[in-house]
Amino acid sequence: MSRRYFGTDGIRGRANGLITPELAMKVGQAAGLVFQRGEYRHRVVIGKDTRLSGYMIETALVAGFTSVGMDVLLLGPMPTPAVAMLTKSMRADLGVMISASHNLFEDNGIKLFGPLGFKLSDDVEKQIEQLLDESLDKKLAESASLGRARRIDGVHDRYIEFAKRTLPRDLSLDGLRVVIDCAHGAAYKVVPEALWELGADVIAIGVEPDGFNINKECGSTAPEALSRKVREMRADIGIALDGDADRVILVDERGHVVDGDQLLAVIAQSWKEDGRLSKPGIVATVMSNLGLERFLQSNGIEMVRTPVGDRYVLEQMLKQGYNVGGEPSGHIILSDYATTGDGFVAALQVLAVVQKLGRPVSEVCHLFEPLPQVLKNVRYRAGKPLEDDEVKSAIHAAEKRLNGHGRLLVRSSGTEPVIRVMGEGDDREMVEEVVDTICSALGEAAAAAA
């Protein structure tokens, strides 16, 4: 069965476009029916980021879950990894995060977690999708068996304590001036407080959500404001999270960006030296730079590649027994601590290395020279541009030209109508030429189908 609703990271789309109150209520009903197992009161945990549409979707989900007899625990704005953690901690049958991650406020989404805090498998998502296309009126709970909903206090403190426990008790961030950019998103309360409790001198930006400004010219996808603030305040480091805080990008004291590949290098090398790698390797995706792979190999660390998407990274980590994985975008999964990407916990591991070595972030966090990499996006409205003959011909010619000199990756986004074209190699000029040629062909195909 084809997947009509679920992408690589839950269900995502324009609020009141794809993501309507009707769909959200139906998701609540369908997911609630799938996760009702055993003769006991069933419960679901729901968190959200700071988008205006979160109120609408939250209310619709509550209606859906309670109508099939599930109790609902409402967390309010919380990072995605916190929702995953609390789903397991609070013994819930299911966890829900209302977020479109790094997208702007117009979009929203619904991410689902199983009782152990892991994202749902493809098979479970298919079960839910099947129910979404059915009438569920005859499967609703009897009047006396309807669920209840209530808001839970103190959840921020639970996540703060969890994050702090990922560092040694004797490690303090005292003496570090840290600028944190929360992207006006889900982490705006918890992360600045946690850094302060760990002893850092905290300067917080992106902590004034108004429902519209999430990820707008801030956060991990737009670190320029953070870079300026770090230089202005003469800070030691900048931390940029995205709207739901499952991604992180750092900025060194000079204002230079440290992406997910460099973070993986820092954590992998440090954990290998400390004997904390479960096996001598990590998991990355096809988007990770060849420079990272060469660096890791020179340090006796294997790198296993997966398709794009943190769910596939985690899948391989669990299957092969690795405890570190991630993506250049800043999804870093440390399975010793979390069941999904946790931007703040990943940042803390790097801060621990900085404190341990007593060296500037610019020295600690730039461990390899990335190969020139060009990444461009082509947006389309209709059709399937990748199936166009001219596009196929352009891709074939580019692969032939790069053979032995670099890598080429052309793929559809799993979360939005975009084709991503990535080229990588020792010769930047040649890489730019082949990427531009493919993008031009894609643009023409997209225009013809519109």
Curated annotation (Swiss-Prot):
Catalytically driven reaction(s): alpha-D-glucosamine 1-phosphate = D-glucosamine 6-phosphate
Enzyme Commission numbers on file: 5.4.2.10
Post-translational changes noted in the entry: Activated by phosphorylation.
Cellular-component GO terms for this entry: cytosol
Keyword Acetylation assigned: no
PTM-bearing positions, type Phosphoserine: S101
CDD domains linked: GlmM
Cofactor note: Binds 1 Mg(2+) ion per subunit.
Gene Ontology MF, one: phosphomannomutase activity
Classification via InterPro entries: A-D-PHexomutase_a/b/a-I, A-D-PHexomutase_a/b/a-I/II/III, A-D-PHexomutase_a/b/a-II, A-D-PHexomutase_a/b/a-III, A-D-PHexomutase_C, A-D-PHexomutase_C_sf, Alpha-D-phosphohexomutase_SF, GlmM_bact
Cofactor(s) listed in the protein's UniProt record: Mg(2+)
Active site, per annotation: S101 (phosphoserine intermediate)
SUPFAM superfamilies recorded: Phosphoglucomutase, C-terminal domain, Phosphoglucomutase, first 3 domains
Positions bound to Mg(2+): S101, D242, D244, D246
Matches recorded under Pfam families: PGM_PMM_I, PGM_PMM_II, PGM_PMM_III, PGM_PMM_IV
Gene3D superfamilies: Alpha-D-Glucose-1,6-Bisphosphate, subunit A, domain 3 (3.40.120.10), Alpha-D-phosphohexomutase, C-terminal domain (3.30.310.50)
GO BP, sorted A to Z: carbohydrate metabolic process; peptidoglycan biosynthetic process; UDP-N-acetylglucosamine biosynthetic process
Record keywords, A-Z: Isomerase, Magnesium, Metal-binding, Phosphoprotein
The family this protein is said to belong to: Belongs to the phosphohexose mutase family.
Main function: Catalyzes the conversion of glucosamine-6-phosphate to glucosamine-1-phosphate.
This protein's name: Phosphoglucosamine mutase
Taxonomic source organism: Rhodopseudomonas palustris (strain BisB18)
Gene coding for it: glmM
